[in-house]
Regions:
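Amphipathic, hydrophobic secondary-structure cores in small proteins
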Residues: 8-9, 19, 24-37
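Structural motif
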Residues: 2, 24-26, 59
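N-terminal acidic leader/helix
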Residues: 1-17
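C-terminal structural segments of small proteins and small subunits
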Residues: 31-33, 37-62
């Protein structure tokens, strides 16, 4: 799944949070969509990753 943000700084903040929680993730280019997101996003297979970012605005693309 891809976790997309409107801000690049939030992508790198989320990456740090997930790595500290030992959740495997990586920063990748954002898939092309109808909406405007920043150019990179988080890619992970861990569904629980969303729980660590409850104070951040994001959307999930599957």
């Amino acid at each position: 799944m891809h976790i997309v943000f409107f801000s690049t700084s939030n992508v790198f903040r989320a990456e740090e949070i997930l790595q500290e929680a030992n959740i495997e993730c990586r920063v990748v280019p954002t898939p092309v969509q109808d909406k405007a997101y920043c150019g990179v996003c988080i890619q992970t297979e861990c569904e629980q990753a969303k729980e660590f970012m409850d104070d951040m605005e994001f959307e999930v693309l599957e």
